[in-house]
Amino acid sequence: MPNLQGNRTLTEWLTLLLGVIVLLVGLFFVIGGADLAMLGGSTYYVLCGILLVASGVFMLMGRTLGAFLYLGALAYTWVWSFWEVGFSPIDLLPRAFGPTILGILVALTIPVLRRMESRRTLRGAV
């Protein structure tokens, strides 16, 4: 059980770990996506990577904004996937499966992030 002294629960540590994972995936997307965009490829990876980096940072700060940024990036991913390949399930799978699984995990962290935010507010932090 969390307290006002700042001790973290297991769910908070797991949420922070997920924030690190999202941040690292975002950095990979930004760096690899920039190379791809310079070669004339899709700018999706750069834009999505920026959203994921911001999401990971906010999750590490214990802010629900991080989860909602990720869910926005996931919606963007689905729109881009349909635009790229249409409604072909076999072609959608590699583009949307991994981000959707990660999105489910991120959505499950929203109550934990809210608790972290409220505790920080009680301590007087902004």
From Swiss-Prot:
Q: What is its main location?
A: membrane
Please report the record's description of how this protein sits within the membrane: Multi-pass membrane protein
Report the GO molecular function annotations: glycerol dehydrogenase (acceptor) activity
Q: Which UniProt keywords apply?
A: Cell membrane, Membrane, Oxidoreductase, Transmembrane, Transmembrane helix
Query: What does it catalyze?
Result: glycerol + A = dihydroxyacetone + AH2
Which leading EC class covers this enzyme? oxidoreductase
* Transmembrane annotation, as ranges: 13-33, 41-61, 67-87, 92-112
Where is it found, in Gene Ontology cellular component terms? Answer: plasma membrane
Q: What name does the UniProt record give this protein?
A: Glycerol dehydrogenase small subunit
Which organism is this entry from?
Gluconobacter thailandicus
